[in-house]
């Protein structure tokens, strides 16, 4: 054994350098969060639970153009349009999304000309049965009402990049 290796083993240089490395990381802020109680901020482009939005006067935005249904690669969206109204517009009678099929690609949101269907900020929507993951129009509108403030803020932050 040579003198250098003997000196290193007696002086425990690897141990001391490892100790200082551990102490350096010990006093830095932790990257881990306490998840149920703390949540990381999400991006304005985050794609979570779907929602149907309303206009400020309370009327639903969806004009039953069926672009979202046509563009959906997973064929998770089903729409039935109602008859035309006196003013020439129409609304949906049925708007269903099968969340089991949905791949959260965001194509429906991009295709919508009136920003009616959006993917909101909610990512905690676990269910106990598959039937609960079949969203009808009432549930989608309720999601839109619940998350409207966050959705509007995210859309306004993302507007320069659209």
UniProtKB/Swiss-Prot annotation:
Protein name (Swiss-Prot/TrEMBL): NADH-quinone oxidoreductase subunit I 1
**E.C. numbers:** 7.1.1.-
Assembly with partners or alone? NDH-1 is composed of 14 different subunits. Subunits NuoA, H, J, K, L, M, N constitute the membrane sector of the complex.
Q: What is its main location?
A: membrane
Query: What compartments host this protein?
Result: Cell inner membrane
Q: Which Gene3D superfamilies match?
A: 3.30.70.3270
Which purpose does this protein serve, as stated in its record?
NDH-1 shuttles electrons from NADH, via FMN and iron-sulfur (Fe-S) centers, to quinones in the respiratory chain. The immediate electron acceptor for the enzyme in this species is believed to be ubiquinone. Couples the redox reaction to proton translocation (for every two electrons transferred, four hydrogen ions are translocated across the cytoplasmic membrane), and thus conserves the redox energy in a proton gradient.
Q: Which cofactor does it need?
A: [4Fe-4S] cluster
What does the entry list as the binding residues for [4Fe-4S] cluster 2? 72, 102, 105, 108
Originating species? Rhodopseudomonas palustris (strain ATCC BAA-98 / CGA009)
Q: Which keywords fit this entry according to its UniProt record? A: 4Fe-4S, Cell inner membrane, Cell membrane, Iron, Iron-sulfur, Membrane, Metal-binding, NAD, Quinone, Repeat, Translocase, Ubiquinone
The UniProt GO MF terms for this protein read:
4 iron, 4 sulfur cluster binding; iron ion binding; NADH:ubiquinone reductase (non-electrogenic) activity; quinone binding
